[in-house]
């Protein structure tokens, strides 16, 4: 019985130890979200971009640029899209004061519908006001002319 208990405890510890999948920058970024001494400021070049008109079946990338206008490192700690037709990527390393970062939204019109579209990307940062930012892109999808 003691051997079974000991084996179970070792197995449980092994599984929980393997669950730590956060990188060092994620750990630092997440702790910066809660530590007011690490708050900084961000300025977005654009928070609304109209990409114009594309054909159904086309894919595009919309780029949102930000600048760290504070005096502490800026962390984009979470970026998520409003739907499955948009896949976001972003600067995952610390953005030092005065430097620029990027959020890119890759949009696949095959996963959407013809007509006007309005898509959003949500960004969480280590800034005191407006910790969550909403980046929006709009445009029109048309059926290609045969």
Where are these regions (language model features)?
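C-terminal motif of bacterial Sec signal peptides marking the signal peptidase cleavage site
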Residues: 14-17
